[in-house]
Amino acid sequence: MATYLFYDTIRLNTSAGGVLNVAEVLLRSMRLSGDDRVQAVSERHPRIYEAARRLGMSRFVLDTLLYNFHRLRAWFSGERVISLFPNYFLPFTLFGRHADSIVVVHDLQYKAYPQYFSRAKRLWLDWCLGRAARSAADVVFISRSSQQDFERHFARCERAAVIFNPVDAGAGAGAGASIPSGAGSAEGRYLIAAYHYYPHKNFGGILALFERMQREGLVDYLDITGNGAADVEQMIATMAPGLRACVRHRGLVSRDELLRLYRGAAAFISLSTFEGFNLSAAEAATLGVPLLLSDIPVHRELFAGYGFFVGGPAIDLAPLARYLAAHRLSRPAWAHSRDCAPDAVATRYFTLKRSHASLAGALP
């Protein structure tokens, strides 16, 4: 039996956002394994973690200290320890090339949109990802598109795997999930979108498409979740008053409320120009909700055959209307819903090191 140390020190970064959510779901699902012991480092070393939090210590420093401590301890004790780093960083060490490690690379947004990152941050990411490429760690990419982006800039990893993000969409999710049709609930027919402050999320494009769909009678409202109330108000200020009243900013909502909003929506909409995975779209798809998506590689990879791809602002609305009507009738299942089930994702992570151990045991 191996011990998996999950470096949840990412929680020290208060702006981790979606990456933190993914890490928490992955940790919960891996803990259900009966074959291996899985422990978060914040629980293995609660006093050290709490001291680091109070002192504002960088997670990179804490990861480096704890990783090297456990490397030395494992050498003396003979314990098989596997370290899992959920967000790109492999600690500095003089002890080998991280063959005992798994590191997750989510996306290369800083390469696609360098203007959003300082020069120091870009250099840091270049250095960290270059080290991951040269390491003996299992490097996990959250989509094939993300891996291809990585390999355009860095060397091909010695041990690379594509494992989709775990999608926890609550009880009753998956094939055949019973959802409202979005055709006339008490809250009206609404699109649902998650607001994000980065311009590449193309929120202006969402507003423009909603305006056209509303005028054609396809939907009544646009519901927006997340922060950014002031930004949303500024963006809709130029709309006609009647249309402006149809944009409903719901703010930060509970997990249960978010899933309820997904289930009642006429469609989920995301027109971003770059994604590494798009967890919100995957959550909606797992619940059987129609998707209106920008036509980018990762959306094609994940949602081809399920979602409707919006090629540009002048899109013909007739095919879109037919898609929504057909989806309401057929209620198709998303092809990757099982691949993204938390238990299936956890199994894939365990398989990475189990396969290496089996191969090593078979060698003479």
Q: What label would you give each PLM region?
A:
Residues 1-364:
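Carbohydrate transferase catalytic cores enriched for Leloir-type hexosyltransferases
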